[in-house]
C-alpha cells in the first residue's frame, strides 16, 4: 500500500476585481492590478512567489498575460493547466487548484507560496495565494 503523507496547504489573500475595459478579454491594467493587489493583501513580495498558475486559455489574452507576468515576475516559474483539463468555465478555480496541489505533491516542493489567478467572462477576475507547508 502507498503511504499517504500530510501535505498541508491553505488558500489565503483572495482578491477580486472587475475589469470594465473589456468584458471578454482581460486588459493588462486589470491583470496587473489583480496580481499586485493580491501580493499587497498577503504582505508578500514578488520574490516570495515560487510559481504562478496562469490562466492561459490558448487565446488572444495569452500574449497579454505573458507580457504582464514578464514585467512583474520575470524569474518565476509558470504552471499551465488548461491544456490538460480544457476550459471548465465556472469550475476552473476549484479544479485547477486541485490539479496544482496534486502536481506539487508529486514534486520536491514541501513549502512555498503559489499565485493562482482566473480571468472570467464579464470581467470577473480573482486571484489567491496557495501556501504550501507550515
Place the predicted regions along the sequence by residue.
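Short glycine/serine/threonine-rich phosphate/pyrophosphate-binding segments
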Residues: 125
Amino acid at each position: 500500500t502507498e503511504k499517504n503523507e500530510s501535505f498541508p496547504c491553505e488558500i489565503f489573500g483572495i482578491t477580486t476585481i472587475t475589469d470594465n475595459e473589456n468584458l471578454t478579454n482581460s486588459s493588462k491594467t486589470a491583470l496587473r492590478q489583480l496580481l499586485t493587489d493580491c501580493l499587497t493583501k498577503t504582505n508578500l513580495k514578488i520574490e516570495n512567489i515560487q510559481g504562478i498558475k496562469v490562466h492561459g486559455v490558448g487565446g488572444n489574452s495569452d500574449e497579454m498575460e505573458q507580457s504582464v507576468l514578464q514585467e512583474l515576475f520575470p524569474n518565476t516559474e509558470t504552471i499551465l493547466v488548461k491544456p490538460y483539463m480544457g476550459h471548465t468555465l465556472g469550475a476552473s478555480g476549484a479544479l485547477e487548484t486541485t490539479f496544482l496541489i496534486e502536481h506539487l505533491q508529486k514534486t520536491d516542493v514541501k513549502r512555498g507560496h503559489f499565485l493562482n489567478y482566473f480571468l472570467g467572462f464579464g470581467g470577473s477576475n480573482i486571484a489567491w495565494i496557495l501556501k504550501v507547508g507550515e
